[in-house]
Amino acid sequence: MTNIRKSHPLIKIVNDAFIDLPAPSNISSWWNFGSLLGVCLTVQILTGLFLAMHYTSDTATAFNSVTHICRDVNYGWLLRYLHANGASMFFICLYLHVGRGLYYGSYTYTETWNVGVILLFAVMATAFMGYVLPWGQMSFWGATVITNLLSAIPYIGTDLVEWIWGGFSVDKATLT
């Protein structure tokens, strides 16, 4: 008589993915962070979509829309806090994932490592946009401080910063 976990078509999929996974015996918990990145990214996308359904980018009503999300939307406060803290968890997992790669010498696989570096820069640019877009003084501060780093580029730095800002300083809502 065969074992049900190896003969049943649906249970066999779960068995092959979780129980009889062909993984080396010396694998450590450091290898979980890639999967945790996927979980965090999924949570970020889903909570971001649900928050975007109620968010208003107009400067006069943006704060009221956040208040509406927290008070009137069912579990809106939970969505907001999951989205905010999920971003922090995402970057913690990301840095631990990169640290694991450095520790185990994954940089010797240059093609794979270069793709990872490009993905890291893309994630940082996306996080910057997500940080700067909402209305508020903190996003103004973030936009000013982070983009001012470009002013260190010789000759074109100041012009580049003014081009990104659209003027001499960050002003109005950055989302519209």
UniProtKB/Swiss-Prot annotation:
CDD domains: Cytochrome_b_N. It is found in: Mitochondrion inner membrane. Its main location: mitochondrion. It holds the Pfam family Cytochrome_B. One of its GO terms (biological process) is mitochondrial electron transport, ubiquinol to cytochrome c. It is a multi-pass membrane protein. Its cofactor is heme b. Binds 2 heme b groups non-covalently. GO terms for cellular component: mitochondrial inner membrane. Heme b b562 binds at residue 83. One of its GO terms (molecular function) is ubiquinol-cytochrome-c reductase activity. It comes from the Eukaryota. Heme 1 (or BL or b562) is low-potential and absorbs at about 562 nm, and heme 2 (or BH or b566) is high-potential and absorbs at about 566 nm. Belongs to the cytochrome b family. Component of the ubiquinol-cytochrome c reductase complex (complex III or cytochrome b-c1 complex) that is part of the mitochondrial respiratory chain. The b-c1 complex mediates electron transfer from ubiquinol to cytochrome c. Contributes to the generation of a proton gradient across the mitochondrial membrane that is then used for ATP synthesis. This is Cytochrome b. It comes from Mormopterus kalinowskii (Kalinowski's mastiff bat). The gene is MT-CYB.
